[in-house]
From Swiss-Prot:
Native source species: Castor fiber (Eurasian beaver)
EC number: 1.7.-.-, 1.11.1.-
InterPro entries found in the cross-reference section: Globin, Globin-like_sf, Myoglobin
Name of the protein in question: Myoglobin
Subunit structure: Monomeric.
Binding site residues for nitrite: 65
Cellular location(s): Cytoplasm, Sarcoplasm
Binding sites annotated in the UniProt record for O2: 65
SUPFAM superfamilies linked: Globin-like (SSF46458)
The protein's enzyme class: oxidoreductase
Gene Ontology CC: one annotated term: extracellular exosome
Amino acid sequence: MGLSDGEWQLVLHVWGKVEADLAGHGQEVLIRLFKGHPETLEKFNKFKHIKSEDEMKASEDLKKHGVTVLTALGGVLKKKGHHEAEIKPLAQSHATKHKIPIKYLEFISEAIIHVLQSKHPGBFGADABGAMNKALELFRKDIAAKYKELGFQG
């Protein structure tokens, strides 16, 4: 399940592109998530009333949350699999406070991959795509293990 040094290099290279515009990427990821899986919107009190893509694009709260999500994920990715300290509080809040099922983390992972493919085709070829998918799968697996420790059946 672990990634090679070369795979981590690919992940972190494209992640540098994400960090250059966290707000734009985060907004696109959340819009893609909510459009593809409208049921996920119910978990977000701040924007569950938003229905149209135009409203989503205009929402400062949505943009801010996109930055929060991608900043946290970037912190995890930069640890190259040694992310216990980063994962623990994320799992705690997502299991006990927000009650986010692992399935929703799969959905947002798909949205992230799609946004990277569309925004960075030159930097996100098959190898980078495969590496990022592995990194996101590792993240989800480790969150799921923490969920289990916490007794959350998400």
